[in-house]
């Protein structure tokens, strides 16, 4: 299978190339916090020679409770992203939830993300495809890896083949997620070698059946990330926070920001090792 290369500016993304880090914060809580977190990521990834794309949401439109914090919104969010790009020279990924958001967001950021809950919404897919931007498709928790080729085909029919696929776990009964390590290769195959990345943060989510917010298993982030990267992936998607207990969204799954460097040292070592192995075809 030939591995497809998708370029985010000058950053090549492919399953057989050194992994790209898609990292940042869950939601833009404030301009100052975004600057602080982005600067830390940039410093560490430059030190470790890891290609880097900053991640944050400007609007969490799918919160469980109507009272939960959603973010600064489109206009203010784009202003913050523009300042981050100007200050740090960083590439940015963010998600869109409605078709009318696609073009104004693509005018500012480098990658637009199709949320897992919306990944089969054809009108949204078509609007995103028309922008010509690089697309990151989150695999829905309720969709099998083998079905992801259909979503990629929608983008291709819409004139955009610059697609990255991202796994964030699959439903395992009620209110729990598991990650099928065999599914990564299935997604590579059905997408004809498109880059596949792993969202370890949201794969750690779990829920109180009667609660209004997600819980998480932050203490297992290193083990799960190691396992995923051992498969041989194009990138890792992770969120970090200086004070996870007081984060406005998904704090229980967020990596403590001060653990980012030792965490990435381990992930890079695994990625370097795996991608130096010769390809071994055991299907025959």
From Swiss-Prot:
One of its GO terms (cellular component) is cytoplasm. Its main location: cytoplasm. GO terms for molecular function: 3-deoxy-8-phosphooctulonate synthase activity. It is found in: Cytoplasm. Its EC number is 2.5.1.55. It is an enzyme of class 2 (transferase). InterPro entries: Aldolase_TIM, DAHP1/KDSA, KDO8P_synthase. Pathway: Carbohydrate biosynthesis; 3-deoxy-D-manno-octulosonate biosynthesis; 3-deoxy-D-manno-octulosonate from D-ribulose 5-phosphate: step 2/3; Bacterial outer membrane biogenesis; lipopolysaccharide biosynthesis. One of its GO terms (biological process) is keto-3-deoxy-D-manno-octulosonic acid biosynthetic process. Keywords: Cytoplasm, Lipopolysaccharide biosynthesis, Transferase. It holds the Pfam family DAHP_synth_1. It catalyses: D-arabinose 5-phosphate + phosphoenolpyruvate + H2O = 3-deoxy-alpha-D-manno-2-octulosonate-8-phosphate + phosphate. Belongs to the KdsA family. HAMAP family: KDO8P_synth. This is 2-dehydro-3-deoxyphosphooctonate aldolase.
């Amino acid at each position: 299978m030939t591995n497809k290369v998708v370029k985010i500016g000058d950053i090549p993304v492919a399953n057989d190339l050194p992994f790209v880090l898609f990292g940042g914060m869950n939601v833009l809580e404030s301009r100052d916090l975004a600057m602080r977190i982005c600067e830390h990521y940039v410093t560490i990834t430059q030190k470790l020679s890891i290609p880097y794309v900053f991640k944050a949401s400007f609007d969490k439109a799918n919160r469980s409770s109507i009272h939960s914090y959603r973010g600064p919104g489109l206009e203010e969010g784009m202003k913050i992203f523009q300042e981050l790009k100007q200050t740090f020279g960083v590439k940015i990924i963010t998600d869109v939830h409605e078709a009318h958001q696609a073009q104004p967001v693509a005018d500012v950021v480098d990658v637009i993300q199709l949320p897992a809950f919306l990944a089969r919404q054809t009108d949204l897919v078509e609007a995103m495809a028309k922008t010509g931007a690089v697309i990151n498709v989150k695999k829905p928790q309720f969709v099998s890896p083998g079905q992801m080729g259909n979503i990629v085909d929608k983008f291709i029919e819409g004139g955009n083949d610059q697609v990255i696929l991202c796994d964030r776990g699959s439903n395992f009964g009620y209110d729990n997620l598991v990650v099928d390590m065999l599914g990564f290769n299935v997604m590579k195959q059905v997408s004809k070698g498109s880059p596949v990345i792993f969202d370890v943060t949201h794969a750690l989510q779990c829920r109180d059946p009667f609660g209004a917010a997600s819980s998480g298993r932050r203490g297992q982030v290193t083990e799960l990330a190691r396992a995923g990267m051992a498969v041989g992936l194009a990138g890792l998607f992770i969120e970090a926070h200086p004070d996870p207990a007081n984060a406005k969204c998904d704090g229980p799954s967020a990596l403590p920001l001060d653990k980012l460097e030792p965490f990435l040292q381990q992930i890079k070592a695994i990625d370097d090792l795996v991608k130096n192995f010769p390809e071994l075809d055991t299907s025959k």
